[in-house]
Curated annotation (Swiss-Prot):
Its cofactor is Zn(2+). GO terms for cellular component: cytosol. Residues 245-251, 269-273 are annotated as: RNA binding. GO terms for molecular function: metal ion binding; tRNA-guanosine(34) queuine transglycosylase activity. It holds the Pfam family TGT. The gene is tgt. Keywords: Glycosyltransferase, Metal-binding, Queuosine biosynthesis, Transferase, tRNA processing, Zinc. PANTHER family: QUEUINE TRNA-RIBOSYLTRANSFERASE. Pathway: tRNA modification; tRNA-queuosine biosynthesis. This is Queuine tRNA-ribosyltransferase. It catalyses: 7-aminomethyl-7-carbaguanine + guanosine(34) in tRNA = 7-aminomethyl-7-carbaguanosine(34) in tRNA + guanine. The active site is at residues 89, 264. Homodimer. Within each dimer, one monomer is responsible for RNA recognition and catalysis, while the other monomer binds to the replacement base PreQ1. Zn(2+) binds at residues 302, 304, 307, 333.
Amino acid sequence: MKYQLQKTDGRARLGKLIFERGLVDTPAFMPVGTYGSVKSMTPDEITETGAQIILGNTFHLWLRPGQDVIKLHGDLHDFMQWQGPILTDSGGFQVFSLNSMRKIEEKGVSFRHPLNGSEIFLSPEKSMEIQLDLGSDIVMVFDECPPYPSDLIYMKSSMEMSLRWANRSREHFNNLNNKNALFGIIQGGLSLELRETSLQGLLQIGFDGYAIGGLAVGEPKEEMYRVLDFLCPRIPDNKPRYLMGVGKPENLVEGVRRGIDMFDCVMPTRNARNGHLFVTHGVIKIRNTRYKTDISPLDPDCDCYTCRHYSRAYLHHLDRCNEILGARLNSIHNVRYYQRLMADLRHAIYEERLECFVEEFYKKIGLSIS
């Protein structure tokens, strides 16, 4: 993978990620394919939304169907028939969300299989091996994801262990002769001092890109933006910057303003399944009775398949009847909304009018600029 920085507007960056499997324009949003699928959508439909890269979940794919089954097909691209680049997380976030079901040690994490109760073990080395078998174009280091809030003593200890795990991840990644990209993950909670220590430690190890983890876990948005304001100028300009798990449209806009290149979140598809649809002027809750007789398109400004063919009344009907087609059409729209937003942000950076775009964006959705 190579990163090309093409233009800046303030701190916002326009660029490209170059893979053997294709190009990714940045800033980019990655739809999440937890179990080897972006829920309810085919690869062709994902491509039609404008998405160029997706995210796969190492932890869940390791448990089901298992890396051996995926290897029978070749790799994850062949298994799910997505031929573009794939980023896989390390499994750390999912393991640490198990709480009482897991035990953290220096060597790794032991936990109970959430499906059958058997004891299994995940380490930095094992995570690198799984992601190699998945054929991940971008591999993430194994790290600890401390809960919010956490006291400073625990946060410091966790960050230091994540640095040691990052070093082990890098060493085993190299030993496996993996030719794809490996990203480090900056931890440290809301402490700028710990964030600085984490970043400097990762820079000494050396990675192809740098992710910011441990945000969007319940902290006020102002705190998240404070951490981004601190970190982004300190990450080398020639490396991509990835803000993990952040997905509200306004958070994407603020991340781009601060110099973030990559985002992922389940929000577009999860909200779609719950009838919460992102449109130019905010959010439509399609199951509300007011849409029962509304024959207008979901979003007149949107060019997705759903908006070109169906009315709000029809989508309301599908949602009320729990029809699977409703979830599919809603997902197509929400993912396209996110891709349109990223394309608009890229175009605004190219034309050096990002702040004008941001002001217009907030006026349309009825929020103030952060």
